[in-house]
Amino acid sequence: MGKIKAIIYYIYFVLSVFVVIFFMAIKNSSHRHFRRIWAKFQRYFLRYKIEIIGTPDENANMIILNHQSIIDIVVMEEIHKANLSWIAKKEIARIPIIGKIITLPKMIAIDRSNPRDLVRVLHEVEDRIENNRVIAMFPEGTRRKGNKLLKFQTGAKVITEKLKLKVQPVVLLGTREILDSHNFCANFFGNVKVVYLPLVDTTDKDWLEKTRSKMQEILDENLYEDSNELPDANKNLNQIKTDKISEK
């Protein structure tokens, strides 16, 4: 049954991407608005709920996230107040028509097979930040199968330190239970939890690995199953704000 649901959802997803691309193409100034509406319709279709713990830091110009499912992007497009510019694989941008979801709203496509492409990416990141965008990236580089975070790629560290960015980690829980691309399975209804951690101290030379460890702590606590207790990695927040977004 889960595979049938996945087929139904992927058909819906692709069609909805065509629709949002069409609207972005005809009205260049409203890309963010259309993307947020699109993300809400994904939630309405899959019928999941979102709980937010912590608060997006207005000073952050980059967020780094764990990657479990394509729903990770959908959730953040709906709830994050800033206009996100995602760093994505160049292969996606090359897909006919679908690739416009990267190029039209000025996301950043990176060629992971070419280390020299990082120079171009740095220029594009700088441009997006100058235009009040917030960079979003998955330092793992790809979706993982298990519950352990993959090693964080050095690209996030290079971009952050070269451009002196302020980085906020975000942990997503429960998205793979909604849509699991590895096992090609979807579940309508479910709960997603988004945990905003404090800004990272990027003056620490080991900040990337320490951030990975903190994010892993959140995952290990299975926070989406126990919303009343925060893991140690998040107890230093001065104030915890929890918002719930229902399927209604």
Language-model features, listed with the residues they occupy:
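Conserved H-X4-D acyltransferase segment
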Residues: R35-A88
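A transmembrane-helix-recognition feature enriched in membrane-embedded lipid enzymes
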Residues: M1-E51, K100-I101
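Residue-level detector of anion-binding/catalytic polar loops
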Residues: K49, S85, I108, V134, ...
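Short, basic/glycine-rich phosphate-binding loops at helix/coil junctions
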Residues: F18-V19, K100-P105, G190, V194-V195
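Membrane-embedded segments
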Residues: I73-E124
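Short acidic-hydrophobic, aromatic-tinged amphipathic segments that line or gate anion-handling sites
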Residues: I52, I108-D111, T202
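Short, basic, glycine/proline-bearing loop/turn elements
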Residues: I37-A39, A60-N61, L104-D111, T142
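Non-catalytic C-terminal accessory region of glycerolipid acyltransferases
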Residues: R120-K248
